A protein has these predicted regions:
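N-terminal beta1-alpha1 ligand-phosphate binding loop
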Residues: 1-28
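Conserved RecA-like P-loop NTPase ATPase core
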Residues: 6, 74, 108, 141
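General small-molecule cofactor/ligand-binding pocket signal
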Residues: 7, 35-37
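Short glycine-rich anion-binding loops that position phosphate/pyrophosphate groups of nucleotides
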Residues: 12, 78-82, 109-112
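Short glycine-/acidic-enriched loop or helix-start segments at secondary-structure transitions
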Residues: 16-18, 84-86, 114-117, 136
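Positively charged, solvent-exposed patches that mediate nucleic-acid binding
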Residues: 19-20, 30-35, 90-107, 111, ...
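S-adenosyl-L-methionine/SAH cofactor-binding core of RNA-modifying enzymes
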Residues: 33, 40-103
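Structured adenosyl-cofactor binding patch, chiefly the S-adenosyl-L-methionine
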Residues: 111, 115-159
Length: 159
C-alpha cells in the first residue's frame, strides 16, 4: 500500500482545518497510509531581513528533509508544475509504479521552502497561481490527494 506523508511547517490553528484534514485522512485509509507530520516553524521578528529568512528556511528545510527521508519528496511551491486532478492521479500512479512506495508532500512556512528542499524534490507541484495560507493549502492538498486516489480507484467521488 502506498505511503503518503504530508510534511508541513507549523500547526493548524483552526479546528475546522484540523477536522477537515482528519476527515480526508480517514477517507484515504482505503487507498493509502497517510501520515501528517508537523515540523516547527522558525520564529522570526516582524522586521526580519533576507539573511534571517534564509537561515530560517534552511533550518526548516533540515527538519522537512529529515521527516521526508526515504520518501520521494514533492515540494509544493509557486514555481512547481500546475496540474489538474486527473494529472495528479496519474503522476502519483507513475511514482507508485516506478517503485516509489512513499511520497512526502512538503508544505513550507509563509516564506516558502528552502532551495535545498526544492533541489531534493523528485517533483515540484504548484497548487495554483493564487496564493493561499499554508494552513489552508494543507487542507486543499488533503482533498486533492483523496480526489486523485479516488480517480485511480474508480470511485464516484470525482465527477
Amino acid at each position: 500500500m502506498l505511503h503518503i506523508k504530508i510534511v508541513a511547517v507549523g500547526t493548524l490553528r483552526d479546528e475546522w482545518q484540523r477536522l477537515g484534514c482528519e476527515e480526508y485522512k480517514k477517507r484515504m485509509g482505503a487507498f493509502c497510509r497517510l501520515q501528517i507530520i508537523e515540523v516547527p516553524e522558525t520564529k522570526l521578528p516582524k522586521n526580519a531581513g533576507a539573511a534571517q529568512i534564509a537561515a530560517a528556511l534552511q533550518a526548516e528545510g533540515r527538519r522537512i528533509t529529515e521527516q521526508a527521508k526515504g520518501s520521494g519528496l514533492v515540494a509544493l511551491c509557486i514555481e512547481g508544475e500546475a496540474v489538474d486532478s486527473q494529472e495528479l492521479s496519474q503522476k502519483i500512479q507513475r511514482f507508485a509504479s516506478n517503485g516509489t512506495g512513499s511520497l512526502a508532500f512538503c508544505i513550507g512556512s509563509s516564506h516558502g521552502l528552502s532551495d535545498e528542499v526544492k533541489n531534493a524534490a523528485v517533483w515540484k507541484l504548484s497548487m495554483s497561481k493564487l496564493t493561499f495560507p499554508h494552513q489552508l493549502a494543507r487542507l486543499m492538498l488533503c482533498e486533492q490527494l483523496y480526489r486523485a486516489l479516488s480517480i485511480t480507484a474508480g470511485t464516484p467521488y470525482h465527477k
